[in-house]
Amino acid sequence: MWGGCIQFRISVPGAKIICFKGHHMSRMSIRGQGQVTGKRSCHLHPLLRCAKGLLLCRPAAGLRHLQNQQNEPSQDPHQCADSCPALHSDRNHLNKEAEAMEGQNPTCSRHESAYPIQSQVSKSKKQRNYVDGAAVDDLKNLWDRLQTLQQSLTEMPYAEGLKPLKNFTSFEELLSMGGDSLLNDLLDIQDSITQCCIRASKYLNKEGNCTSLNYYKQPFIAAVYGPTGCGKSQLLRNLMSAQLIVPTPETVFFITPQVDMIPPQEIAAWETQICEGNFLAGPENTVVPQSGSIMPRFIQMSYAQLTKDENYDVTSPNNIFANAASKGPIAIVMDECMEDLGGNRGIAKFFHAFPSKLLDRFPKCTGYSVIVVLHNMNPRRDQGGNIANLKIQAKVHMISPKVHPSQLNRFINIYTKGQPTAISLLLKDIFNYHRLNTNFDWIVYNTEPIDNCMHWMYLSPQEGLIPMYLNIQGKLYQALERIHRTLTDRQRWTRYYHSKKK
C-alpha cells in the first residue's frame, strides 16, 4: 500500500493511523477501537536502529562482594539469649513493652563495650568480587552497544583523525580478564544509561517515539533549513496534522512574499491537514477536538501585511494576531520569505517580545508558535538582523540532510561542543548517510529539550520522531575509553616488567 512505503494490516476496526505517501504524511481515522500492525521498510543509520531499542534496557546490577572470611564462631553458651520470653507468653498483656518480673528470664544489657572480650573476625586484605547473573546480563547488554558504537566509529569516513581504541576480542575475555575495577566502572556506566532511559521513557510512546516537539513549552520558535525540493512545505503541514506541536493551534497564519503565490491545491492541503490535526478518535465511534475550535482557521498573509505597525501593538484593535489570540492558540508560518527577512525591516519582536505580551494579555492563548523556513543556513544578506535573531531565539532547528555539508559541519561544530570529538564526527556521519540513502528525512536539534536524550532527534516518514540519545552515546564512548585505558596500562606495565627482567 502507498508505493510499498508502509504496509498495514488492521486486525480490529477502530484505529488511527498516521502514514506517509512518499514525502506526504496523512492520518486515517477508523471507527471503533482496535489494533494496527504495520510493516515498514526504512533505511536508518545503524546507530539510529540501535537507539530504537534503548528503552528495553534493564536496571543495572552491581557486583556481589564475597570476602575471604573465616567461619562464624559458635555462640558462647554463657552469652545472653537473643530473645527472652516474658511472663505473658501469649502476649495478651495490655502493655506490650512490659518488662518481665524479677527473676523470670532477666533481660540482658545490649550495650557494646569499647573493648569487647571476643576479638573481631580477621578479614583478608584482598577481596574477590563475583559477578552475579543480573550483572552479567547488564554487561552483555552494554557490550553489544559498545560493539555497535565502535563499529560505527571505525567504518565512518571521518574516522581517519580518531585515535583507535583498544578493546577485548570477546565478551568472555572481558569477563575473565577485565578485572574488578573495570567491571565495576562499566556497571556504573550501564546503570547511568538505564537511569537516562527511564527518565526519557516518560515522554515517549510505546514504540519509543517522541509525542511532541515542544511538550507544551511556550513560545515555540522553530527554524527549518533545507534546499529547494527537500519537502519543507510538506513538513510544515505534517507538523500540524501529526500533532507534534502542542497545544494544537486554532488559527494558522501562512506568510509568503505575496498572497497569490500559493496554488489552490496547496491551500486545500493546508486546510485539510490542520483540520485533521485538530481531532483524535474518541470512545463509541466519536472524534474529540483538541482545541476550542471545531474548524481551525487558515489565514493567508503577505510579508508586507505582517510588518504593519498595527500588528506590532498588542493593544491595537486592528492587530490581527491579537484578535486571533483572544480566542485560542495561534501559529505563524513563514515560507519563501528569506529574501524579505534579509531586508532592513526588523521583525525580531515576533520571536521574543511579542509572544510574551500576547500570552500574558490573553489567557485563552495557551500556545504561540513561529516557524520560519530558510533555504540557506548562513545567508549573506541579513541587514535587519532578523535571521541572526531567529537563530538565537529558536528553540528547535529542523535541518534537512540535503543541506550543503560545509554548512552542516559548521552547525554541528557549534552545537556539539560539550560532546566528545568522536560523537560530533558520528553525528556528521549520520547526516551524510541519510543525505545519500534517504529522502524527506530531517534531523532536529532542540536547544531546550524536556530530557537530555532529546537534544538531537530524527524525523522520518517511516519511523516518526525518535530521539538520537547522543548523551548515551557519549557515555558509551566513555566506556570504550575506560577499556582502552585499562588495556594500555597493562601493556605498559608488561613492557616495564620485561625490561626489568632482562
From Swiss-Prot:
GO MF, one example: ATP binding
GO CC annotation, single: host cell nucleolus
Main location (coarse class): virion
Keyword Transcription regulation set for record: yes
GO terms for biological process, alphabetical: DNA-templated transcription; nuclear capsid assembly; regulation of DNA-templated transcription; viral DNA genome packaging via site-specific sequence recognition; viral release from host cell; viral transcription
Name of one Pfam family that matches: Adeno_IVa2
Binding site for ATP: 226-233
Induction line: Expressed in the intermediate phase of the viral replicative cycle.
Family membership: Belongs to the adenoviridae packaging protein 1 family.
Known partners and oligomeric status: Homodimer. Part of a genome packaging complex composed of packaging proteins 1, 2 and 3; this complex specifically binds to the packaging sequence on the left end of viral genomic DNA and performs packaging of the viral genome. Interacts with protein 33K.
Function: Component of the packaging machinery which encapsidates the viral DNA into preformed capsids and transcriptional activator of the viral major late promoter (MLP). Binds, along with packaging proteins 2 and 3, to the specific packaging sequence on the left end of viral genomic DNA and displays ATPase activity thereby providing the power stroke of the packaging machinery. The activity of packaging protein IVa2 is stimulated by protein 33K which acts as a terminase. May be the protein that pumps DNA into the capsid powered by ATP hydrolysis.
Identification of the protein by name: Packaging protein 1
Source organism (scientific name): Canine adenovirus serotype 1 (strain RI261) (CAdV-1)
